[in-house]
A protein has these predicted regions:
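Conserved N-terminal beta-strand and adjoining loop/helix that marks the start
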Residues: 1-37
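A generic structural micro-feature
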Residues: 5-9, 50, 101, 105-112, ...
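A structural signal for short, well-ordered beta-strand segments
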Residues: 15, 85, 116-118
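Conserved hydrophobic "DFG−1" position in protein kinase catalytic cores
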Residues: 17-18, 39, 118-120, 136
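Conserved Nudix-box catalytic region and its N-terminal flanking loop in Nudix hydrolases
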Residues: 32-74
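A short coil-to-beta-strand element that immediately follows conserved catalytic motifs
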Residues: 79-88
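Active-site-adjacent beta-strand/loop module that shapes the phosphate/pyrophosphate-binding cleft
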Residues: 90-124
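Nudix hydrolase/Nudix homology domain
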Residues: 124-164
């Protein structure tokens, strides 16, 4: 099924990867007591160049937890353990890629996104597949990022629920 101008919504997953430094330098954490969330800078459309959650589209035959673990690994290099579902969100993007035609009401992208709280369980932090960059952020850094749509809410929800 095509992602751009789809015939029906696509099911996607997002990984809210939250951690503290537990002596795992390969995870890129340097301040032991401050919880952080791992975000990627998107390397492809939609939302090219924006900071977002690692994630992607569910593949046929894959469980939601398998999909979120696969996408997290592909985009961050980390093996993660999905612990709980944080929410279900819908993302509908209309119009052309420039956003300059207000009369273009076509659905360009339509995703139903299921986001999971995840914790790193191994791997080496590196941007991969369609991520241009990957980085840990603290809660005070989040407002400046202007995260896409509902991403900020689910990130804060994940930080609030983390008992590490």
């Amino acid at each position: 099924m095509k992602r751009e101008y789809p015939e029906s919504p696509l099911v996607g997953v997002g990984a809210v990867i939250v951690a503290r430094n537990h002596g795992l330098p390969q995870h890129g954490l340097d301040q032991p007591d401050e919880p952080r969330v791992l975000l990627i800078r998107r390397g492809t459309a939609p939302l090219l160049g924006e900071w977002s959650l690692p994630g992607g589209v569910l593949e046929c035959g894959e469980t939601l937890r398998e999909a979120v673990a696969r996408e997290a690994f592909e985009e961050t290099g980390l093996v993660v353990e999905p612990t709980e579902m944080l929410g279900v969100y819908e993302r509908v993007i209309r119009g052309n890629d420039k956003g300059n035609d207000k009369n273009d009401k076509r659905v360009r992208y339509h995703y139903v996104l299921i986001d999971f709280l995840c914790h790193p369980a191994g791997g080496d932090l590196k941007a991969g597949s369609d991520a241009a960059d990957v980085r840990w952020f603290t809660r005070p850094e989040l407002p400046a990022l202007k995260l896409a749509y509902d991403a900020n809410d689910v990130v804060l929800k994940g930080l609030n629920r983390t008992q590490i």
